Amino acid sequence: MADLLRKVKSIKKKQDQSNHQALILGKYEMGRLLGHGTFAKVYLARNAQSGESVAIKVIDKEKVLKSGLIAHIKREISILRRVRHPNIVQLFEVMATKSKIYFVMEYVKGGELFNKVAKGRLKEEMARKYFQQLISAVSFCHFRGVYHRDLKPENLLLDENGNLKVSDFGLSAVSDQIRQDGLFHTFCGTPAYVAPEVLARKGYDGAKVDIWSCGVILFVLMAGFLPFHDRNVMAMYKKIYRGDFRCPRWFPVEINRLLIRMLETKPERRFTMPDIMETSWFKKGFKHIKFYVEDDHQLCNVADDDEIESIESVSGRSSTVSEPEDFESFDGRRRGGSMPRPASLNAFDLISFSPGFDLSGLFEDDGEGSRFVSGAPVGQIISKLEEIARIVSFTVRKKDCKVSLEGSREGSMKGPLSIAAEIFELTPALVVVEVKKKGGDKMEYDEFCNKELKPKLQNLSSENGQRVSGSRSLPSFLLSDTD
């Protein structure tokens, strides 16, 4: 009897330990294993508070350190922070313990596109839909300076609504890695989907390599088999290098023409993303999407726990994830309570704003942004930004002293224009408002600033032109450009 009681207590203790361990960082309940690799395992998990299903990539920190792959992990985090798009698997947050690194990501329930294609070729309309979503996502990545370099059906997932999601940015590269010749030189990718210039090992354009892979994927969707296939890998490479493929007889003429240009062996003659998106076959039924571009610096989070150590060595920073739901949509509502006080600027902030110690650097022309100093109340500045947004039919999102203006113009591969404004306290009587482009086309941003933003904010100066005591060297309102 005593032995039985001891066994029951032992089992109960193990169950309690298991339940405690299953709640990762006090937030996520770990579920079944979804997949694994050399350094990481991916689990299905559930947010204990919201009930939302997520996928958690658990990376063994010791293995990563021993293999010298810290830079690789940092780059993957940086890339996932850059590419938030409806057709890309989303990174929610990054956390760490002393032994593990956790990527909390969107859980895509439908599985790999590969499994769908393995059953046979797709109908033209279905293939077109997936291809449109793929091009939309990849072109956005290119605009953000990210090149996937390993696009294939196995890395394309389908959600419960049948929408495509690009995943696995582990082999991706960013513009910063381009050498002095303007090209990448790392040999990577999956043999059947790799571009001929990668095989040549002479340097390659990351965008053109992705376009080649997208062409192979389109062929596979329509045909049910690969355009370049041979049991002998070297023989397959020769076919790729020569561009030796034939389209099946059931391919429409428009697809034949598109594939010939996408699978052009000479990169300089290969179609670009705009070329693809301008073809009549691509444009048929293409649904332009609206999405929210987050500030790059708001995507990493390190949980605060006794068992947690900083991921500073991995992510380079720690900050809270800011989801669109945290912002208040533009419908005239305000949160309860008074207007929040802006964050104060200290001497170090001012120096970081300026190229030198001379504060006149605050007001110099130097890039895609603007700052102005104003004596107007915070509420009045925000109201003016809302008024400008109403005039041009932009959506406004607000959180404390941050305002996001989001355009709705569709059709640009760079996404809709998105602008962030943040208010800082300079003195008790003065504030600095920093305005920056978060997403969209630079020419559209410049036009918006010159025609809408600057003139209407200058009007604020005349409405609040009273001089603030002790501010003779700083006008009550001065608009200028900066980084």
Swiss-Prot record:
<dbReference type="Pfam" id="PF00069">
    <property type="entry name" value="Pkinase"/>
</dbReference>
<feature type="region of interest" description="Disordered">
    <location>
        <begin position="313"/>
        <end position="338"/>
    </location>
</feature>
<keyword id="KW-0723">Serine/threonine-protein kinase</keyword>
<keyword id="KW-0547">Nucleotide-binding</keyword>
<comment type="function">
    <text>CIPK serine-threonine protein kinases interact with CBL proteins. Binding of a CBL protein to the regulatory NAF domain of CIPK protein lead to the activation of the kinase in a calcium-dependent manner.</text>
</comment>
<dbReference type="GO" id="GO:0106310">
    <property type="term" value="F:protein serine kinase activity"/>
</dbReference>
<feature type="compositionally biased region" description="Polar residues">
    <location>
        <begin position="313"/>
        <end position="322"/>
    </location>
</feature>
<dbReference type="Pfam" id="PF03822">
    <property type="entry name" value="NAF"/>
</dbReference>
<feature type="region of interest" description="Disordered">
    <location>
        <begin position="459"/>
        <end position="483"/>
    </location>
</feature>
<keyword id="KW-0597">Phosphoprotein</keyword>
<dbReference type="InterPro" id="IPR017441">
    <property type="entry name" value="Protein_kinase_ATP_BS"/>
</dbReference>
<dbReference type="GO" id="GO:0007165">
    <property type="term" value="P:signal transduction"/>
</dbReference>
<dbReference type="GO" id="GO:0005524">
    <property type="term" value="F:ATP binding"/>
</dbReference>
<feature type="domain" description="Protein kinase">
    <location>
        <begin position="28"/>
        <end position="282"/>
    </location>
</feature>
<feature type="modified residue" description="Phosphothreonine">
    <location>
        <position position="186"/>
    </location>
</feature>
<dbReference type="InterPro" id="IPR011009">
    <property type="entry name" value="Kinase-like_dom_sf"/>
</dbReference>
<feature type="region of interest" description="Activation loop">
    <location>
        <begin position="168"/>
        <end position="197"/>
    </location>
</feature>
<protein>
    <recommendedName>
        <fullName>CBL-interacting serine/threonine-protein kinase 19</fullName>
        <ecNumber>2.7.11.1</ecNumber>
    </recommendedName>
</protein>
<dbReference type="InterPro" id="IPR000719">
    <property type="entry name" value="Prot_kinase_dom"/>
</dbReference>
<dbReference type="InterPro" id="IPR008271">
    <property type="entry name" value="Ser/Thr_kinase_AS"/>
</dbReference>
<feature type="active site" description="Proton acceptor">
    <location>
        <position position="150"/>
    </location>
</feature>
<comment type="similarity">
    <text>Belongs to the protein kinase superfamily. CAMK Ser/Thr protein kinase family. SNF1 subfamily.</text>
</comment>
<keyword id="KW-0464">Manganese</keyword>
<dbReference type="InterPro" id="IPR004041">
    <property type="entry name" value="NAF_dom"/>
</dbReference>
<feature type="binding site">
    <location>
        <position position="57"/>
    </location>
    <ligand>
        <name>ATP</name>
    </ligand>
</feature>
<feature type="modified residue" description="Phosphoserine">
    <location>
        <position position="172"/>
    </location>
</feature>
<feature type="domain" description="NAF">
    <location>
        <begin position="340"/>
        <end position="364"/>
    </location>
</feature>
<dbReference type="GO" id="GO:0004674">
    <property type="term" value="F:protein serine/threonine kinase activity"/>
</dbReference>
<feature type="binding site">
    <location>
        <begin position="34"/>
        <end position="42"/>
    </location>
    <ligand>
        <name>ATP</name>
    </ligand>
</feature>
<keyword id="KW-0808">Transferase</keyword>
<keyword id="KW-0067">ATP-binding</keyword>
<keyword id="KW-0418">Kinase</keyword>
<dbReference type="InterPro" id="IPR018451">
    <property type="entry name" value="NAF/FISL_domain"/>
</dbReference>
<feature type="region of interest" description="PPI">
    <location>
        <begin position="367"/>
        <end position="396"/>
    </location>
</feature>
